[in-house]
Amino acid sequence: MKKIWLALAGMVLAFSASAAQISDGKQYITLDKPVAGEPQVLEFFSFYCPHCYQFEEVLHVSDNVKKKLPEGTKMTKYHVEFLGPLGKELTQAWAVAMALGVEDKVTVPLFEAVQKTQTVQSAADIRKVFVDAGVKGEDYDAAWNSFVVKSLVAQQEKAAADLQLQGVPAMFVNGKYQINPQGMDTSSMDVFVQQYADTVKYLVDKK
């Protein structure tokens, strides 16, 4: 029993030490110009970005962050248009995914079609990925030029500009803080992901 307790105490101490070590300029950066009105937790990515693919498919960073967030905390993902020949079209397609609520259905297929099989070479190819993932073609077409999708595209572009986004993947909290992966412990993938998620939670609680 004593051994179990000591092990548990060690875990608590390790967690406390980890939380205490989160600091401005290391695991996160306070923005010089905070941006009001941004989603609580905002992640920027591109289907063309190899590191974004790693974050999503290998490290599962987004999933781990979501698990740590307090109940009711909204996490939003925006696509950027400044990477790749179909950056604009993929940003619009991501807006379609948000409008139809099919982000989880199309994320992995789009990453794989853009980076792995390289079968996305046109707007029609993007549409095919959606259809193959179970989205009705008519629903996709109706959403593509809709007011809602146009607004979501503008929203993504404005957020990237307002936050002076330099590259992806990138995550911001409350429009005030940017996560700094370069300051994370990279001794193992699990430790890195855990610290990343802990840092986001710390900043959400900090407000």
Curated annotation (Swiss-Prot):
Signal peptide: 1-19
One GO molecular-function entry: protein disulfide isomerase activity
InterPro entries linked: DSBA-like_thioredoxin_dom (IPR001853), DsbA/DsbL (IPR023205), Thiol_disulfide_DsbA (IPR050824), Thioredoxin-like_sf (IPR036249), Thioredoxin_CS (IPR017937), Thioredoxin_domain (IPR013766)
Biological-process GO terms, alphabetical: cellular response to antibiotic
Disulfide bonds: C49-C52
A GO cellular component annotation in the UniProt record: outer membrane-bounded periplasmic space
Gene3D superfamilies: Glutaredoxin (3.40.30.10)
Keyword vocabulary terms for this entry: Disulfide bond, Periplasm, Redox-active center, Signal
Family recorded in the similarity comment: Belongs to the thioredoxin family. DsbA subfamily.
Protein name as catalogued: Thiol:disulfide interchange protein DsbA
Organism whose genome encodes this protein: Salmonella typhimurium (strain LT2 / SGSC1412 / ATCC 700720)
Source taxonomy: Bacteria, Pseudomonadati, Pseudomonadota, Gammaproteobacteria, Enterobacterales
Name of the gene this protein is made from: dsbA
